[in-house]
A protein has these predicted regions:
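Short, small/polar-rich loop/turn modules that mediate ligand/substrate recognition or access, typified
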Residues: 56-58, 125-127
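Active-site loop immediately N-terminal to the catalytic Tyr-X3-Lys motif
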Residues: 24-30, 102, 120
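Residue(s) in the substrate-gating loop at a strand-loop-helix junction
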Residues: 19
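Conserved SDR Rossmann-fold cofactor-binding beta-strand/turn motif
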Residues: 58-68, 118, 131-133
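A glycine/serine/threonine-rich, flexible loop-to-helix segment
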Residues: 66-98
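Conserved loop-to-helix N-cap of the C-terminal "lid" that shapes the substrate pocket in Rossmann-like
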Residues: 61, 88-92, 101-111, 135
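Alpha-helical segment proximal to the catalytic Tyr-Lys
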Residues: 48-52, 123
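Active-site helix of classical SDR
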Residues: 35, 43
Length: 139
């Protein structure tokens, strides 16, 4: 990342994919929280370093909540096992209910956030984390 930053003459943006699990922790998957928390702090550190060195590169992160993807489905299966049930749909419904907005996220929700962070519309943002979680962490 540093080499690319040195080569950029006109400025650009880096968007790192983190997670709300890196902001609040997870009792069911602490290693996932550990790695996503690392991404969050790496983002802030890189943003500060690039700014200090005068690189015209903004570095931000995006923090999705629970998103309807293959990875999300695998998580529901794993959690169902941990709860000693085979009812994956019930686990998915429990996850949906934790989001005040009343639904799980879809990949397009995250894509729009990434587009914003990569665009000039966020030109005054660096070292920030955009939380796209349907209100999950607002509770």
């Amino acid at each position: 990342m540093r080499e690319r930053a040195r080569q950029s003459a006109h400025g650009s943006a880096i968007v790192n994919l983190a997670s709300v699990a890196g902001l609040v922790g997870s009792q069911l998957d602490p290693l996932y929280s550990l790695t996503k928390g690392g991404v969050t702090l790496f983002t802030k550190s890189a943003a500060l370093e690039f700014a200090r060195k005068g690189y015209r590169i903004r570095v931000n992160s995006i923090h999705p909540g629970v998103i309807q993807t293959d990875m999300g489905d695998q998580t529901f299966v794993s959690r169902a096992r941990n709860l000693a049930t085979n009812d994956v749909d019930a686990v998915r419904e429990m996850a949906r209910k934790t989001h005040p907005i009343g639904r799980l996220g879809v990949p397009e929700d995250i894509a729009k956030g990434i587009l914003y962070l990569a665009s000039d519309d966020s030109a005054f943002m660096t070292g920030a984390g955009l939380v796209v979680d349907g209100g999950l962490t607002a509770q």
